[in-house]
C-alpha cells in the first residue's frame, strides 16, 4: 500500500529517521521529545516525520515495524527502537557504535557528557 511504500522510501533515502508525534522543533509527546533531544544534542543530521499529520503513516509505521508505539527510530533503513531502547543504547554506548558502524557523524563528546550526567 501507499503508506508502506512511502515509509520504505523515506527510511531508504535518509540515514536517520524518527517517526514521531510532532516535529524536531515542536515535539508533541515526552517520548518523541526525548529522542529528538538526544539526536539534536549529538548534532546528528536526521529527518523527522510527524505521524500526527497522516493517520496512514501513523498506523502504517506500526505495521511496518511490527512495533506498537511511537516514536520509532530508523538508521540506514533498519528499525532501531523506540524511546526506552534508544535511551538505553545512548547510556550504554551502543548508540555511538551504531552511528560509527554506519558512518553517521555525531558529537562523541556530547554523547560522553550525557553518559557522565547519568552515571
Per-region residue spans from a language model:
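Non-catalytic, surface beta->alpha helical segment in thiol-disulfide oxidoreductase systems
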Residues: 75-110
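Terminal leader/tail segments of proteins
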Residues: 52, 57, 97-119
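N-terminal leader/targeting and pre-domain segments
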Residues: 1-17, 107-119
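Short Fe-S-cluster ligation motifs
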Residues: 59-69, 110-113
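Thiol-based oxidoreductase modules, predominantly thioredoxin-like and allied folds used
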Residues: 40-59, 67-68
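Beta-strand cores of modular interaction/reader domains in eukaryotic scaffold and signaling proteins
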Residues: 17-19, 45-50, 72-74, 79
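Local sequence-structure signature of Cys/Sec-based thiol-disulfide redox active-site neighborhoods
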Residues: 7-45
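Eukaryotic intrinsically disordered and solvent-exposed regulatory patches
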Residues: 3-5, 58-61
Amino acid at each position: 500500500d501507499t503508506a508502506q511504500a512511502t515509509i520504505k522510501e523515506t527510511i531508504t533515502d535518509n540515514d536517520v529517521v524518527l517517526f514521531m508525534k510532532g516535529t524536531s522543533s515542536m515535539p508533541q509527546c515526552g517520548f518523541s521529545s526525548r529522542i529528538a533531544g538526544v539526536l539534536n544534542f549529538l548534532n546528528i543530521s536526521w529527518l523527522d516525520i510527524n505521524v500526527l499529520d497522516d493517520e496512514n503513516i501513523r498506523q502504517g509505521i506500526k505495521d511496518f515495524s511490527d512495533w506498537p508505539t511511537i516514536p520509532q527510530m530508523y538508521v540506514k533503513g533498519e528499525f532501531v527502537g523506540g524511546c526506552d531502547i534508544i535511551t538505553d543504547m545512548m547510556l550504554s554506548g551502543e548508540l555511538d557504535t551504531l552511528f560509527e558502524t554506519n558512518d553517521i557523524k555525531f558529537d562523541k563528546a556530547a554523547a560522553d557528557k550525557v553518559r557522565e550526567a547519568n552515571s
